[in-house]
Amino acid sequence: MSPQPSRSPDRFSLAALAEDHPTAPAQGDESESLPCVNAQRGEPNLRVVDCSGARRDEEVAVEEVLIPYAHGSDPEDVPGEPPKSRWWLSSGAAVAMHVAIIGALVWVMPTPAELNLGHGELPKTMQVNFVQLEKKAEPTPQPPAAAPEPTPPKIEEPKPEPPKPKPVEKPKPKPKPKPKPVENAIPKAKPKPEPKPKPEPEPSTEASSQPSPSSAAPPPAPTVGQSTPGAQTAPSGSQGPAGLPSGSLNDSDIKPLRMDPPVYPRMAQARGIEGRVKVLFTITSDGRIDDIQVLESVPSRMFDREVRQAMAKWRFEPRVSGGKIVARQATKMFFFKIEKRR
């Protein structure tokens, strides 16, 4: 591998020249011409000069190599004359060795495509423009948010006072309806019953509006939860709308066995409500109560349930008419009053 030319193309390695062209013993001032290294440029040949005049021993020969220069490069160097000093030779050899090493490295290392210049061409200049980056605009400090104005407390409007409850007016008792005359059905011929001895009257809790002379004592005064009998709606022996004989419980042919009074409702008693209930009912052939109908209720539906519950437990003796047990209708008036303590 031959070294590439550098900025000093006339300097080469002395060692390479010595190996390729060994020197011969000098005789007098004779010199041996070497082939021209820079023959392409037309530079003069190198000469190896034998310094025989300065040797002390015949066996030792000192050879000096003169580094050629281009014609007219240095006016002081004259071809054929010895060098000025020895240090110039050593320094030139060192420089040549460094140049050769650098040239070898440059040859081996790949060069960029831009730097592959032709012979005698100058490297192209590269223009570099420095751009100054704009500084980021600092965010402008925002003014502190104004504190929200305190909202005035809402003034609560005074709530209107609830209206006072109106006092409950006691219902006025309705006038008793006049009993309508019942059309008598066609009377059928009935066999006359055999006369029986009259039984002794049993004390009862009912009494008619007009006390009968047969009763031994007047009925007890009404108390809370007790009832008093009502007036007759039809005379004894008459028939009701269903074709059954009707009358009042005061009739002698109606004999009760069990008559529990109704219970006074707690709500009505607590409010001091009094009233009355009139019912029409049927006494079956086995002495039970059936078909209870409310004819009058004051206040409306206040005591109806208690009356029905009490009458469901009533029992009567079967009524015999013409040798047969028959059913009949009857009416009853219940009064609900509160005893006042003295």
Curated annotation (Swiss-Prot):
Pfam family, one: TonB_C
Cytoplasmic side: 1-87
Entry membrane topology: Single-pass membrane protein
Polar residues: bias regions: 224-239
Signal peptide residue numbers: none
Compositional bias annotation for Basic and acidic residues: 154-172, 191-201
Segments on the Periplasmic face: 109-342
Domain TonB C-terminal: 249-342
Keyword Repeat among UniProt keywords: yes
Localization (cell): Cell inner membrane
Domain of life: Bacteria
Membrane-spanning intervals of the chain: 88-108
Subunit architecture: Homodimer. Forms a complex with the accessory proteins ExbB and ExbD.
Chain's role: Interacts with outer membrane receptor proteins that carry out high-affinity binding and energy dependent uptake into the periplasmic space of specific substrates. It could act to transduce energy from the cytoplasmic membrane to specific energy-requiring processes in the outer membrane, resulting in the release into the periplasm of ligands bound by these outer membrane proteins.
Protein's recorded name: Protein TonB
Organism, as annotated: Pseudomonas aeruginosa (strain ATCC 15692 / DSM 22644 / CIP 104116 / JCM 14847 / LMG 12228 / 1C / PRS 101 / PAO1)
